[in-house]
Amino acid sequence: MALSFGVFMKLKILSLDISMSNLGMAKAIYDTETQQLTITECMTISPVITKTKTVRQNSKDIERAKQLFDGLFNPMKDADIVCAEVPVGSQSARAMCSYGISVAILAAVAIIKPNFIEVSPLEVKLTVGSKTASKTDVIKWVVAKHPTAPLELYRGQINLSKAEHQADAIVAIHAAMKTPLFKQIINLYKDKP
């Protein structure tokens, strides 16, 4: 729940960057008085699926979806606001399957957490400053903006395969903060007694 200090509050935000292979998450605190965003936690959920020929693909897809939702359920519980980079469709059937499952998981999150803000991949890239921003550009932007953000490390270095999803989730918060819906939600919390 939001921590209240008079009319000013510290709101807990959870941000998501979802695909069937990786779910990047970032938890943050937004101070309504200073308008400062502090990244408190970063994590990536990567479903583990056994590669067995005897298991049907749709059963593997259900298992992936279960692992993704299970991994985000607890972090979502205490969030005042959830925002997500919503994936876009694709040409291949397999990619569309991933898209459908990802969007369904986000729809479930939006039902559980009505203060849900969706942003597009383009909005995320434009927040970094370029509609063609690479994953490395996004990570560099996050490190410059939030040097203490706990991006996942491997042997003391940023783990690019995990951190790219966490960085996208962090930038999604910044993109969400630019939306009218974010401002409406902040005003609703300020108006609460």
Each language-model region and where it sits:
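Phosphate- and other anionic-substrate recognition elements at nucleic-acid/protein interfaces
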Residues: 2-193
